[in-house]
Amino acid sequence: MKGSRSKQPEITPDMLLRAYSIGLFPMADSANDPELFWVEPEIRGVLPLDRFHVSHSLAKRIRKRPYEIRFDTAFEAVIEGCAKPAPGRPTTWINDKIRSLYAALHRMGYAHSVEAWEGDRLVGGLYGVSLGAAFFGESMFSLRTDASKICLVHLVERLRARHFQLLDTQFTTEHLKSFGAVDVPKAEYDLLLARAIASPNLEF
């Protein structure tokens, strides 16, 4: 992980929102580490909403509607799913403080979840923060084939419909790059962020 970081003894929800507005976000070294630190990557992951790409195979699967997609009905359960170890991800950075902070942002109307349901079981989802015309994606999880990918597609559809300008993925992965995510230098990201944050808070 490239980018500056500094220890922060106590982070409040309001402080967290201010941090997002200037390009910072918190992480922990592990789920068991009680400390948080601010991260400000020199290279930022961004998923351009006008260049979002869905593969033919995924589009075909989405048309079959394998899951019911809901928004903001099980926010804390989504964080819990993201915090659990998974194949290829033996540990995560989501500690108890992260859960508490983002649950507070959710109650304040700033943090949101996209959820994939199979009957009454949550089988995938993602969560993030909405501020101005920007959405900051935090994490995702999947217990069924393509569940988190389908949630991402529905997230982008929703952001486009509501005229969001920026989808920040923090970092890029090969998974996100397959959808069109790109690495953006900090100076360019700062301009994109300032433009999006200058907008009134858009309804998610």
UniProtKB/Swiss-Prot annotation:
Q: What class of enzyme is it?
A: transferase
**Where does it reside?**
Cytoplasm
Record-listed E.C. numbers: 2.3.2.6
UniProt GO MF annotations = leucyl-tRNA--protein transferase activity
Catalysed reaction, written as an equation: N-terminal L-lysyl-[protein] + L-leucyl-tRNA(Leu) = N-terminal L-leucyl-L-lysyl-[protein] + tRNA(Leu) + H(+); N-terminal L-arginyl-[protein] + L-leucyl-tRNA(Leu) = N-terminal L-leucyl-L-arginyl-[protein] + tRNA(Leu) + H(+); L-phenylalanyl-tRNA(Phe) + an N-terminal L-alpha-aminoacyl-[protein] = an N-terminal L-phenylalanyl-L-alpha-aminoacyl-[protein] + tRNA(Phe)
Which UniProt keywords are present, listed alphabetically? Acyltransferase, Cytoplasm, Transferase
Gene Ontology CC entries for this record: cytoplasm
Gene3D superfamilies named in the record: Leucyl/phenylalanyl-tRNA-protein transferase, C-terminal domain (3.40.630.70)
State a single Pfam family of this protein: Leu_Phe_trans
SUPFAM superfamilies for this protein: Acyl-CoA N-acyltransferases (Nat)
Main location per UniProt? cytoplasm
In its UniProt record, which GO terms are filed under biological process?
A: protein catabolic process
**What family is this?**
Belongs to the L/F-transferase family.
**Role this protein plays:** Functions in the N-end rule pathway of protein degradation where it conjugates Leu, Phe and, less efficiently, Met from aminoacyl-tRNAs to the N-termini of proteins containing an N-terminal arginine or lysine.
Name the chain's protein. Leucyl/phenylalanyl-tRNA--protein transferase
- Species whose genome carries this gene: Sinorhizobium fredii (strain NBRC 101917 / NGR234)
The major lineage groups are: Bacteria, Pseudomonadati, Pseudomonadota, Alphaproteobacteria, Hyphomicrobiales
Q: Which gene produces this protein?
A: aat
